[in-house]
Amino acid sequence: NLDHSKSWNCQLFRSITDDSADLDPSKSRSLNSKKGRLLDASIAQAFIQMIRGSHNFIYMESQFFMGSAYSWLKNDDVSCDHTIPAEIAQKIVEKIHSGERYVAYVVIAMFPEGDPSGYLVQEQLYWQTRTMEMMYSRIAEAIRETGNGTHPTGKCNFNVKKIAYFINTKE
């Protein structure tokens, strides 16, 4: 007899676009089209399901951790819509209000793929900052409301992973 209350559930998700796979829209309900490109939306659905079903913590790695622009403190009129950051923040807020332990561990790239000083990477880092700011603000508000003596970084922990970046290397 296994005690499932003490078991772990680990899922691995990998996103794909029509650049990396031959996608047939007639065979999948999770394909969306954005700017003329097909992408598989099932990863977002899977993340949301895992976030909502998690009990004590969630661990995720993402090269591009940004989204939920509709909840940002500063409205930048950006189409950075996916809901995963807001889902994580909401889960943490719910756990704070119920007095339960919960931590989100998010590992992000020090620099997204591309030239670190380039406009696109700098814009992505800015959006990532707005995303983290929104999450920490919501968590801090829940901590204040409940009188919980913790700090938001004790509930949502961002860790930076250094990824090697090479520009036009020649042997």
PLM regions: where:
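Charged, low-complexity intrinsically disordered terminal segments
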Residues: 1-171
